């Protein structure tokens, strides 16, 4: 398992390995891992190979013992020759199961290495997909409330402390802060990828734990920091959030995400097949395709996590206009480090060390001259100096 993981890792990042001239280091690490595998496999195969001969030798010793002892007793006229033959048959019936056990032991030994990971996976606690007396998502407007939320991936280390906020239907909420402040974690809690340690998250007054997970997540459309596209046609990837969408709807979503013109330049258009890692399109184009997928899904709540971090400035402006149209009348959460993209947000939540230290719109936060103003001015100064 370790050597397979190492090979897969190096294969996936072979360009980085070559760029840093680490081929010899990678080969050396592979040889070390392979030597460990060879030594353990050699011992395993040696013991497995010796098991059957040893069992057969033990069985043959039984025949020899019966023959010698039986011959001696026959000479003494203690038993008959027929009794000796009977004992030989009994020995065969006794040794045959032992040999079968040895064969099974070889099979168990060969699967022992994999069983540890398999049972580790099976022992993982499954998500509770269904709630008792679940609340229907039909008719929900998209009002979101965080009530004194506490959370930590490790209960002994809480990273989000007493998080509280109210978001009204149709508002655009921006969450900003330094790396590790807890911005992305809040989104994962909202969609119940994790459950809060204490407190509650509510949608239209209903605790999100009262919804079935699948129905809850149907309310959300996501554009993640790490784009994900599967091996298949471009149209199938865009339709992932709405499998029954027509081709015309796919094209409309692509136009709204400003990716339609790019798709038209491809030899097969929307039927072009993306490879396993979608490496036959650029990172910016992958970002646009995921935005088109979110537009087509038409969610009630939209989540953008660094949505425009991998595209050029011109494309970013186009995407921002398209997303502004999409977010009208729809509750939207935007996570971004470039504060220039969220100046029009209805509410900006400034997070630091898991806590909301400031909140308000862009102008209000600048007037406070606090942490947000410090972040914004530092980015503006950096942009000016680079220009």
Region locations from a protein language model:
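An intracellular "coupling" helix at the cytosolic face of ABC transporter transmembrane type-1 domains
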Residues: 2-9, 15-61, 107-110, 127, ...
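Conserved catalytic core of Hanks-type protein kinase domains
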Residues: 10, 20, 121, 265
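Transmembrane helix-loop junction
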Residues: 18-19, 72, 76, 265, ...
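Conserved catalytic Walker-motif region of ABC-type ATPase nucleotide-binding domains
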Residues: 30, 118, 146-148
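Helix-loop-helix
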Residues: 43-117, 121-122
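ABC-type nucleotide-binding domain
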Residues: 123, 130-131, 137-387
């Amino acid at each position: 398992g370790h050597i397979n993981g190492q090979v897969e890792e190096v294969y996936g990042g072979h360009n980085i390995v070559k760029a840093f001239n680490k081929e010899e280091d990678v080969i050396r690490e592979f040889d070390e891992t392979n030597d460990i595998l060879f030594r353990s496999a050699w011992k395993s195969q040696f013991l497995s190979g010796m098991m059957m001969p040893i069992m057969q030798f033990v069985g043959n010793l039984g025949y020899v013992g019966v023959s010698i002892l039986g011959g001696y007793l026959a000479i003494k006229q203690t038993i008959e020759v027929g009794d000796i033959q009977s004992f030989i048959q009994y020995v065969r019936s006794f040794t045959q199961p032992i040999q079968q056990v040895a064969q099974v032991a070889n099979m168990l030994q060969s699967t022992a290495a994999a069983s540890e990971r398999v049972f580790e996976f099976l022992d993982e606690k499954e998500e509770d997909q269904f709630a008792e007396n679940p609340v229907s998502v039909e008719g929900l407007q998209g009002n979101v409330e965080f009530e004194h939320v506490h959370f930590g991936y490790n209960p002994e280390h809480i990273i989000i402390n007493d998080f509280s906020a109210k978001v009204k239907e149709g508002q655009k909420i921006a969450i900003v802060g330094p790396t590790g402040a807890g911005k992305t974690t809040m989104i994962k809690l909202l969609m119940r990828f994790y459950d809060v340690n204490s407190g509650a998250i509510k949608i239209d007054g209903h605790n999100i734990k009262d919804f079935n997970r699948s129905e809850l997540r149907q309310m959300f459309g996501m554009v993640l920091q790490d784009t994900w596209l599967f091996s298949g046609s471009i149209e199938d990837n865009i339709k992932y959030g709405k499998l029954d969408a027509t081709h015309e709807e796919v094209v409309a979503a692509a136009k709204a995400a400003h990716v339609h013109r790019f798709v038209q330049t491809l030899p097969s258009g929307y039927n072009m097949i993306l490879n396993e890692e979608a490496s036959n399109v650029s990172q910016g184009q992958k970002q646009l395709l995921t935005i088109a997928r979110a537009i087509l899904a038409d969610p009630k709540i939209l989540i953008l996590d660094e949505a425009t971090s991998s595209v050029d400035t011109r494309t970013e402006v186009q995407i921002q206009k398209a997303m502004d149209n999409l977010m009208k009348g729809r509750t939207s959460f935007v996570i971004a480090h470039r504060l220039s993209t969220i100046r029009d947000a209805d509410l900006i939540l400034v997070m630091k060390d898991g806590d909301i230290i400031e909140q308000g719109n862009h102008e209000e936060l600048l007037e406070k001259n606090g942490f947000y103003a410090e972040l914004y001015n530092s980015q503006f100064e950096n942009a000016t100096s680079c220009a």
